[in-house]
Amino acid sequence: MIDVIMTGELLKTVTRAIVALVSEARIHFLEKGLHSRAVDPANVAMVIVDIPKDSFEVYNIDEEKTIGVDMDRIFDISKSISTKDLVELIVEDESTLKVKFGSVEYKVALIDPSAIRKEPRIPELELPAKIVMDAGEFKKAIAAADKISDQVIFRSDKEGFRIEAKGDVDSIVFHMTETELIEFNGGEARSMFSVDYLKEFCKVAGSGDLLTIHLGTNYPVRLVFELVGGRAKVEYILAPRIESE
Amino acid sequence: MIDVIMTGELLKTVTRAIVALVSEARIHFLEKGLHSRAVDPANVAMVIVDIPKDSFEVYNIDEEKTIGVDMDRIFDISKSISTKDLVELIVEDESTLKVKFGSVEYKVALIDPSAIRKEPRIPELELPAKIVMDAGEFKKAIAAADKISDQVIFRSDKEGFRIEAKGDVDSIVFHMTETELIEFNGGEARSMFSVDYLKEFCKVAGSGDLLTIHLGTNYPVRLVFELVGGRAKVEYILAPRIESE
Amino acid sequence: MIDVIMTGELLKTVTRAIVALVSEARIHFLEKGLHSRAVDPANVAMVIVDIPKDSFEVYNIDEEKTIGVDMDRIFDISKSISTKDLVELIVEDESTLKVKFGSVEYKVALIDPSAIRKEPRIPELELPAKIVMDAGEFKKAIAAADKISDQVIFRSDKEGFRIEAKGDVDSIVFHMTETELIEFNGGEARSMFSVDYLKEFCKVAGSGDLLTIHLGTNYPVRLVFELVGGRAKVEYILAPRIESE
């Protein structure tokens, strides 16, 4: 038996974060809170969502439980929910998830979790560079890069953090120095990534949200977003592209 | 000779209400105010519009008069009018309608009313259930139902008023009890309707508008919207769908 | 060497004004400020842009200089710039334009100005009627006319200034008298123009911007927009259409 209450904003954020990569997901209701993770069908990116128990208005579970959810349907219905609405999620038996908001009760059949693609192990990555910045600034940089190219280079060194994109006749560099960043360890790293994935990740975030980037060289990047005033943590791990230079 | 002045908001509302069902309509300028009604080409729905004389800023007619109007054209031009603009409608001869707003005078040829599809008789319906609610809430319920199915069931009984939609793997119930409704007689009734029509009807209304629903069992429903602060009454009568269960 | 700083709003306005007609343009950095002009490929319209030196935050040029710019690319990237951002344009050598805003540096290859279509001579036009009005009103009139026809007649006489459009069953007249206009010389003139061009021109302007119209009879019209609080002057010259009556 699961019975939790959260804000519409929180539900919309979690749902948006996951549908960026997959349409079905396993959601774990653990003692410490909600957890979910999944890799996209192309095996290029992973999403890891954590909502601590305290971020919910009410968090009642009689035991730790895993459900399989059609995220596309929840995402669709979440568009009818206002950010300030309170939303109640109820699972009374194995077969149905109830989503209650305002005068509406939405019921959707659960999916057998074992029928959903096996969950990824979270890789242990040693990433030398750590950059903490405003997610809104990052989003703007990716939007600008997207006008130039479908891939970007993230580069970190003593002089700061750079996002670079190169077109046939033009190029763009986003550059923040240590003093402009919220936190920066000056680590040396450089990898290339797909803009399409990054754009998709940015959709959950806005100005005021905190983004921590862990970067290596020709290595996956970890993008950790702290969302909804810190009440939700959404992490994306994205595989690098091979530079053909 | 007709010479009336109304707000842009009122004109836009009337026009929106009618184009939901037909592209040409007869408009009656009566002693008591403007009246129009029409059925859609599929004979599934009827719209009845009434704007009392007092809702106009100026209402001058030398005798009761009926004109035939290309509503699509008026709807199109009404998009150039702001809600707060004052709009003057003038008919000096049988052939032309003038719409004046700001520095603009728009003229459109009238249609011979006898060339427009015969107006429906308003049916006498005995509908046991009466529900009064905020039109904005209704609109949200229909928008949510639309994500699940193309038909909804309206159901009324002692426990309140319900709007239900059923998809293959999910379902939604909007439920308001007597205390949540503005007025409710607890009458027993249940009918199924097309979501597409209901969505179209809702476009005239918003939060704060009053909606009265008269419901029967496998019978047409009457949806009476009080719009523009009560200055316009728009009623839709919608035929039920047959449940194939 | 060019090094100038302007607001995002100003850059966006200049760029929007030029891409209305051409995708590549010569930009002159003169002692007195920025100047550019171009005719569209169909030879129907000309744009003339002038930004006085004082409209820039910083205006440093070591000598007068002409660059060839891919305006479509600048327009594209300008969508990533906020109106309130400060934007720095830098040309250090013949080959590259740098556009710096926030933490972003955008570089685009310059085009050899001699490879861009020869600039037009600005025609000397004797236009009897002069009309000064709010650009927002003009924009609304063109938007309304656009719903009726693809051409409009501009007409000026003692009774004021008119914009007229005629459809098959409807027509629209926008009419402002001398007292409603900001300035008006009552000159007699009448010409017909393409709505598509006028709509395109209006995109740079909004309510509060000043528009001066110089009109003749079956003659090109001059539309002079004062934009961004008077800091930019954008003039369009549009050839008339021949009336086939």
UniProtKB/Swiss-Prot annotation, chains A, B, C:
Any GO BP annotation: regulation of DNA replication
Disulfide bonds: none
Keywords associated with the record: DNA replication, DNA-binding
Pfam families: PCNA_C, PCNA_N
PROSITE patterns (UniProt xref): PCNA_1
The keyword DNA-binding is annotated on this UniProt entry: yes
MF annotations from Gene Ontology: DNA binding; DNA polymerase processivity factor activity
Entry similarity comment: Belongs to the PCNA family.
Description of how the protein assembles with itself and partners: Homotrimer. The subunits circularize to form a toroid; DNA passes through its center. Replication factor C (RFC) is required to load the toroid on the DNA.
Purpose of the protein: Sliding clamp subunit that acts as a moving platform for DNA processing. Responsible for tethering the catalytic subunit of DNA polymerase and other proteins to DNA during high-speed replication.
HAMAP family: DNApol_clamp_arch
Name of the protein described by the UniProt record: DNA polymerase sliding clamp
Source taxonomy: Archaea, Methanobacteriati, Methanobacteriota, Archaeoglobi, Archaeoglobales
Gene name tied to this protein: pcn
